[in-house]
From Swiss-Prot:
GO terms for biological process: glycogen biosynthetic process. SUPFAM superfamilies: (Trans)glycosidases, E set domains, Glycosyl hydrolase domain. It comes from the Bacteria. SMART domains: Aamy. This is 1,4-alpha-glucan branching enzyme GlgB. Gene3D superfamilies: Glycosidases (3.20.20.80), Golgi alpha-mannosidase II (2.60.40.1180), Immunoglobulins (2.60.40.10). Monomer.
Amino acid sequence: MTIPCSRPLFIEPFDLYLFGMGRHRHLYRILGAHPAVQDGEAGYRFAVWAPNARSVHLSGDCNGWRHEGCPLFPVGVSGVWAAFVPGVRRGSLYKFVVRGADGRQEQKADPFALWAEMRPGVASVAWDIDNHAWGDGAWMAERARQGLPLERPVSIYEVHLGSWRRRHGDGHPFLTYDELGDQLIPYATGLGFTHLELLPVAEHPLDQSWGYQTGHYYAPTSRFGSPEGFKRFVDRCHQAGLGVILDWVPAHFPRDAWSLGRFDGTALYEHLDPRLGEHPDWGTYIFNYGRNEVRNFLTANALYWLREFHIDGLRMDAVASMLYLDYSREAGQWLPNRHGGRENLDAVDFLREVNTVIHAEFPGAMTLAEESTAWPGVSRPVYTGGLGFSFKWNMGWMHDTLGYLAEDPIHRAYHHGSLTFSMLYAFSENFVLPLSHDEVVHGKGALLSKMPGDMWQQQANLRLLYAYQWAHPGKKLLFMGGEFGQWNEWDESRELDWCLYRFPAHEGIARLVGDLNRLLRSEPAMHRRDHDWSGFRWVDFADYGSSVISFLRLAAGERPLLWIFNFTPVVRRFYRVPCPRGGTWRELCNTDSAYYGGSDVGNAGAVMAREDHWGGGHFIELTLPPLAAMCFAPVTGQGT
């Protein structure tokens, strides 16, 4: 084998200056591996940041995986090592052999690798970025023109690509990106979802981590194909009218010796002190957000997914663990900030910076925070003191609602506040209402199995839950399998129980989800004022004895929608509900319809509002189906 001879590589001083300042927005085009030609020879240029390393060599299939012979050369005092290596081809596997400041030699994956080999291998793959001709220009232009979808319908289908569907019989369990495009896109659009949210697709070594322990931050996982395969998938989503959100993990990274940890023999990407640099629950390292180069690594990574893969949004995982220095720590296990407080000021600055940069460079791209505390202003602009996210997951709504519905209906009257409490803070943030993967794992059971009663009551409760979620102010998110009433808890090692579609009750649940999405899209009152009190008005929140609530969804100049919910299995006849106008109110939704698997109790499709001579105004008198929600709209007239 001919051993290629590496050569010094020139890097523009301004690029190195921007990197040192933490401000290089195209950093992934400077560091990492990229095709190049030098002195008429084709090869790849390699660059890696390892300021405390004693030496760095390239090892790969281009040189028989020798640990020496292809050295990288220090670029001034920047801490970057770089070289041009002729003869390296697209698809070549490689690692960096780093002799650290501690004298130890480790084989490291490239932090900026554009692709990586299939697990259990962890080598990086020499690849290139500009390898796809995009066809989603109309989508991208319209997204930028419209801006954030605060007043537009957003219904998110959360998906783990490795277990949505699986192949059988050929030894490779995963669908390719192209096969996922053939099957997942028409399925999600057929149900009326506006966006997919994908659990992390950045390369990760352990299937059981679901992608939340990222090994290669810049490499789409090879489980489903190549980076351009993922680009084709996103392109097809956009051309079908479906947005794509990625779960992104800037909170922590795994301790594997080949990864970012102790990269140059020192705590480079993480803090040295375990009270700052190690997560006690997950056994992972925490990024040092106060270091310019680390912050640049993460910020450029966020921009990379948005720019190079046309991603429509990033959902940031475990934001609460970033914000608090004492997160999941006892007294004496954490260090206070410079003011003596528990807030991680460096992480706060990082989150504000990355949100500001994303919204400036990509108008219309969303950032979503999984933040489970009462930190103020998560989805408020940075210039007002907020963190700058577009949306925040409403974990309180999820916890209270699922807790309420887990109660036997006979006890729900004593927990009525759990149902109504969310409206006290519903407009304090731009909320997404999540029924996510976290609620159907680790012994929690599937959503359907959380519901009390016999099989019919469980299914009715689930339909009631979905109607309440869609009617409640806030954007919507549902994890895969929930749309047809998956019985079993989610297992990342097997596909969903698609056989349940053969049962009419489960098919009915899917029909309901599709109709709720169509109602969300077609009725402005269902989405236009999701984050403002002017879009919601209680009709009756106090009938705890019957476990019935009712409210209006409103939009200026549009017809109001009246929602009524009966959280007991009792049919309530001649039930009076105030309404804002007289005339006929047509039924738009009844979750007890036989079409959805219900008992078909209803009001023949419409009710007549009558004048209330005693208290003024108008009311309707109707039959409330058991464990069901109903939605009515006035037949004539506009506005509120």
